[in-house]
A protein has these predicted regions:
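Extracellular/periplasmic, surface-exposed regions of secreted and cell-surface proteins
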Residues: 3-41, 51-249
Length: 249
C-alpha cells in the first residue's frame, strides 16, 4: 500500500489598541489536509488464483476559523483590577473523499484500477458542520487576595435543528488567597493556601453531523438495480447536552 499525506496550517492575526487599556484582536486560521492511498494485490500471488486487485482512495479535510476579541483592563489605586473580554468565534469544517477497488487484473505489470474487469467496492463521502459562538468573561482582583470571575457564552451548531441550534452556558468562580493575608504572609513554611469555589454549565454537541435530518440513500439495492431507501428518520428535537458542575477546593 502506498500512502501520501500532507497538511497545511496557517494563522493570520492583527492586534489594535484604539484607546488605552483596550486591545482588539482578530485571527483567521486554516487547517487543510490531503491524503491518498493506492493498494494492489498481484495476480501471481497464490491466494489470488490469477486474479489481481487494485484500489485507490483520496480525502480532503478543511477547517476554517475566525475569532475576534475585545479585551479591556483597568486598575484603580493598585488595589482593584478588572479585566473584561468580549468575543465572537466562527468555525466551518468540510471533508470529502472517495474510494474504488477493482478486481480481475491478469498481469502483474498491469495492476492499476482501470485494468480490472469489475469494480468490487466503491463509495464517496461529503460531510460538513459549522459553529458560531459569542462569549463574555469578567475578572476582578482585589490586592491579590480576593478574586471573582464570571463568564457566559452562547453557541450555535449546525448539527441541531433550527429550534434547538443555540445553547447558553455560564460560570461563576471565587477564590480567596489566604496566604497573602497579613496573618499568614510571613509564615515561611506555608507556601500556598487558597480556597476556591466555582459553579457553571458546559455543553456538548458531539453527535454525527446530520442526525437531526431525515435522510434517504441510494445504490444497487434492488436485485443490483439502482434504488432509493429511507436511511434515518431524523430528529429535529436534538439539542445541546448540558452539564452543571460545582467545585470546591
Amino acid at each position: 500500500c502506498i500512502r501520501d499525506r500532507y497538511k497545511v496550517l496557517s494563522t493570520v492575526f492583527a492586534n489594535i489598541t484604539p484607546i488605552k487599556n483596550l486591545t482588539i484582536r482578530t485571527q483567521f486560521g486554516a487547517d487543510y489536509s490531503h491524503s491518498t492511498a493506492f493498494m494492489q494485490s498481484y495476480p501471481s500471488y497464490v491466494i489470488n488464483n490469477g486474479m489481481g486487485s487494485a484500489g485507490r482512495n483520496s480525502s480532503d479535510v478543511l477547517t476554517l476559523s475566525e475569532t475576534t476579541t475585545a479585551n479591556y483592563r483597568w486598575e484603580l489605586n493598585e488595589s482593584h483590577s478588572l479585566n473584561f473580554l468580549l468575543g465572537q468565534e466562527a468555525v466551518n469544517f468540510e471533508s470529502t473523499g472517495f474510494q474504488v477497488v477493482s478486481r480481475g487484473q491478469a498481469n502483474d505489470k498491469l495492476t492499476n484500477v482501470t485494468s480490472g474487469t469489475r469494480a468490487s467496492a466503491w463509495g464517496d463521502s461529503n460531510s460538513s458542520y459549522s459553529y458560531l459562538s459569542f462569549f463574555f468573561r469578567g475578572e476582578y482582583n482585589y490586592k491579590d487576595l480576593y478574586y471573582a470571575e464570571m463568564a457566559a457564552r452562547t453557541d450555535a451548531s449546525s448539527r441541531f435543528g433550527k429550534d434547538h441550534r443555540w445553547g447558553v452556558f455560564w460560570s461563576l468562580g471565587f477564590m480567596w488567597n489566604i496566604k497573602n493575608e497579613s496573618f499568614l504572609k510571613d509564615v515561611e513554611w506555608l507556601t500556598s493556601a487558597q480556597i476556591a469555589l466555582s459553579t457553571g454549565t458546559s455543553g456538548n454537541s458531539e453527535i454525527p453531523n446530520y442526525d437531526h435530518l431525515a435522510l434517504v440513500a441510494g445504490g444497487p439495492n434492488y436485485n443490483d438495480e439502482a434504488g432509493i431507501y429511507p436511511k434515518q428518520p431524523g430528529n429535529e428535537d436534538l439539542g445541546w447536552e448540558q452539564t452543571w458542575a460545582n467545585n470546591v477546593g
